[in-house]
Protein backbone atom coordinates (compact mmCIF):
# COMPACT_ATOMS: atom_id res chain seq x y z
CA UNK A 1 0.00 0.00 0.00
CA UNK A 2 1.19 3.52 -0.78
CA UNK A 3 0.51 6.49 1.47
CA UNK A 4 0.98 10.25 1.29
CA UNK A 5 3.55 11.64 3.74
CA UNK A 6 5.11 15.02 4.44
CA UNK A 7 8.23 15.19 2.27
CA UNK A 8 9.24 18.81 2.89
CA UNK A 9 8.15 21.69 5.09
CA UNK A 10 9.14 25.34 5.31
CA UNK A 11 7.79 26.39 8.70
CA UNK A 12 6.58 29.90 9.56
CA UNK A 13 7.71 32.12 6.72
CA UNK A 14 6.40 35.64 6.27
CA UNK A 15 4.58 36.66 3.07
CA UNK A 16 6.66 39.32 1.31
CA UNK A 17 4.30 39.93 -1.59
CA UNK A 18 1.06 39.11 -3.37
CA UNK A 19 0.82 39.56 -7.16
CA UNK A 20 -2.76 39.10 -8.35
CA UNK A 21 -1.85 39.76 -12.00
CA UNK A 22 0.75 36.98 -12.22
CA UNK A 23 -0.47 33.74 -13.83
CA UNK A 24 -0.31 31.65 -10.65
CA UNK A 25 1.97 29.85 -8.19
CA UNK A 26 4.09 30.75 -5.19
CA UNK A 27 7.54 32.28 -5.59
CA UNK A 28 9.99 30.99 -2.96
CA UNK A 29 13.60 32.07 -2.34
CA UNK A 30 15.64 29.37 -4.09
CA UNK A 31 17.84 28.90 -1.00
CA UNK A 32 14.73 27.90 0.98
CA UNK A 33 13.61 25.60 -1.83
CA UNK A 34 16.94 23.77 -1.85
CA UNK A 35 17.08 23.48 1.94
CA UNK A 36 13.60 21.93 1.93
CA UNK A 37 14.22 19.71 -1.13
CA UNK A 38 11.41 21.39 -3.07
CA UNK A 39 11.84 21.74 -6.83
CA UNK A 40 10.48 24.12 -9.44
CA UNK A 41 6.96 23.16 -10.47
CA UNK A 42 6.35 20.95 -7.43
CA UNK A 43 2.85 20.98 -5.96
CA UNK A 44 2.71 22.41 -2.44
CA UNK A 45 0.07 23.07 0.18
CA UNK A 46 0.05 26.54 1.72
CA UNK A 47 -1.33 26.97 5.24
CA UNK A 48 -1.94 30.56 6.34
CA UNK A 49 -1.56 30.81 10.12
CA UNK A 50 -3.21 34.24 10.20
CA UNK A 51 -6.55 33.42 8.58
CA UNK A 52 -6.71 29.61 8.45
CA UNK A 53 -6.76 29.43 4.64
CA UNK A 54 -5.32 26.34 2.98
CA UNK A 55 -4.60 26.12 -0.73
CA UNK A 56 -2.54 24.19 -3.25
CA UNK A 57 -0.35 25.64 -5.95
CA UNK A 58 3.03 25.04 -7.59
CA UNK A 59 6.46 26.51 -6.88
CA UNK A 60 8.61 28.85 -8.93
CA UNK A 61 12.09 29.85 -7.72
CA UNK A 62 12.74 33.34 -6.43
CA UNK A 63 16.04 35.14 -6.09
CA UNK A 64 18.45 33.56 -3.64
CA UNK A 65 19.10 35.09 -0.23
CA UNK A 66 16.13 37.47 -0.48
CA UNK A 67 13.61 35.65 1.71
CA UNK A 68 11.01 36.11 -1.02
CA UNK A 69 7.65 34.45 -0.42
CA UNK A 70 5.14 35.79 -2.97
CA UNK A 71 1.71 34.36 -3.69
CA UNK A 72 0.73 34.86 -7.31
CA UNK A 73 -2.52 34.85 -9.27
CA UNK A 74 -5.76 33.95 -7.49
CA UNK A 75 -3.82 32.74 -4.43
CA UNK A 76 -2.80 36.36 -3.83
CA UNK A 77 -6.34 36.96 -2.54
CA UNK A 78 -5.77 34.42 0.25
CA UNK A 79 -2.86 36.26 1.93
CA UNK A 80 -1.74 39.66 3.11
CA UNK A 81 1.82 40.88 3.23
CA UNK A 82 3.25 39.86 6.60
CA UNK A 83 1.03 36.77 7.04
CA UNK A 84 2.81 33.70 8.44
CA UNK A 85 2.69 30.57 6.26
CA UNK A 86 3.64 26.93 6.45
CA UNK A 87 4.58 25.45 3.06
CA UNK A 88 4.26 21.67 2.80
CA UNK A 89 5.16 19.25 -0.01
CA UNK A 90 4.00 15.64 0.13
CA UNK A 91 5.40 12.45 -1.34
CA UNK A 92 3.85 9.06 -2.05
CA UNK A 93 5.69 5.99 -0.86
CA UNK A 94 5.23 2.46 0.33
CA UNK A 95 4.14 2.10 3.94
CA UNK A 96 7.38 0.39 4.97
CA UNK A 97 9.52 3.10 3.34
CA UNK A 98 7.40 5.79 5.02
CA UNK A 99 8.03 4.33 8.47
CA UNK A 100 11.73 5.28 8.22
CA UNK A 101 11.46 8.36 6.00
CA UNK A 102 12.71 11.67 7.43
CA UNK A 103 11.25 14.81 5.81
CA UNK A 104 13.25 17.95 5.06
CA UNK A 105 12.15 20.50 7.66
CA UNK A 106 13.27 24.12 7.35
CA UNK A 107 12.82 26.73 10.10
CA UNK A 108 13.94 30.06 8.63
CA UNK A 109 14.38 33.27 10.58
CA UNK A 110 10.84 34.54 11.25
CA UNK A 111 11.69 38.17 10.51
CA UNK A 112 13.80 37.83 7.35
CA UNK A 113 12.77 34.38 5.99
CA UNK A 114 16.49 33.67 5.53
CA UNK A 115 18.14 30.42 6.53
CA UNK A 116 19.60 30.52 10.04
From Swiss-Prot:
The keyword Aminoacyl-tRNA synthetase does not apply. Gene3D superfamilies: 2.40.40.20. One of its GO terms (biological process) is alanine biosynthetic process. Catalyzes the pyruvoyl-dependent decarboxylation of aspartate to produce beta-alanine. Is synthesized initially as an inactive proenzyme, which is activated by self-cleavage at a specific serine bond to produce a beta-subunit with a hydroxyl group at its C-terminus and an alpha-subunit with a pyruvoyl group at its N-terminus. The keyword Cytoplasm applies. The active site is at 25 (schiff-base intermediate with substrate), 58 (proton donor). CDD domains: Asp_decarbox. Pathway: Cofactor biosynthesis; (R)-pantothenate biosynthesis; beta-alanine from L-aspartate: step 1/1. PANTHER family: ASPARTATE 1-DECARBOXYLASE. One of its GO terms (molecular function) is aspartate 1-decarboxylase activity. Its EC number is 4.1.1.11. Binds 1 pyruvoyl group covalently per subunit. Its main location: cytoplasm. This is Aspartate 1-decarboxylase. The gene is panD.
Amino acid sequence: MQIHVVKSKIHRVKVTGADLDYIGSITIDEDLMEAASIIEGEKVQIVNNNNGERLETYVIPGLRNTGEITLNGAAARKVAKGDILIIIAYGIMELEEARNFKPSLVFPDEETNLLK
